[in-house]
């Protein structure tokens, strides 16, 4: 689980969050629109929409923005977004998974391929790296939800597989298929989660040096800056010394 904390800390480093936040609301709105379009526009009847709204609220997205994104799904002239997954390789033989919501597959594929190439990586075929990741559910809580023992006990009772706690919060992992059931059980014991989502968790991490880590960060930053890209996952890890430099 150490790789999860490391990746999160590197991606959430100082100076990066302002750049990410400027695009965050539009990405969250797109997920809400897609979720509302895929089912009923009522979050009580649409699990995906309920989670999308919950995650948007966790990022302090205004209610007006959320309502507008839901209404957009009902519009006759609203865009149709496709869910696309790209898989590729970064510096040092690292694996990268990119999830996107796009209204133009050709544009997004071209942009993603270009970003990989410029960073010294390569876009692969679907399935080329995802076999080395597990698609799991992740439920996060702030530290205020309780101490590590309380959260661990609640997670076990809810049917979760693992819990990781650090200075930022609690990260509960469960089977992807059980995400709705586990999150509902946790809500009964710990209250509403900060985020509930499906993630790609690397089975094994690939150690890289500082130079390759810097290149990987630039690659991932460029991917995240693309309007169509929703999530990026990788399997690299660095030493504690390098982590301290990268997170500064």
From Swiss-Prot:
One of its GO terms (cellular component) is cytosol. The keyword Thylakoid does not apply. This is Probable transcriptional regulatory protein RHE_CH03475. It comes from Rhizobium etli (strain ATCC 51251 / DSM 11541 / JCM 21823 / NBRC 15573 / CFN 42). Keywords: Cytoplasm, DNA-binding, Transcription, Transcription regulation. Signal peptide: none annotated. Its main location: cytoplasm. Gene3D superfamilies: 1.10.10.200, 3.30.70.980.
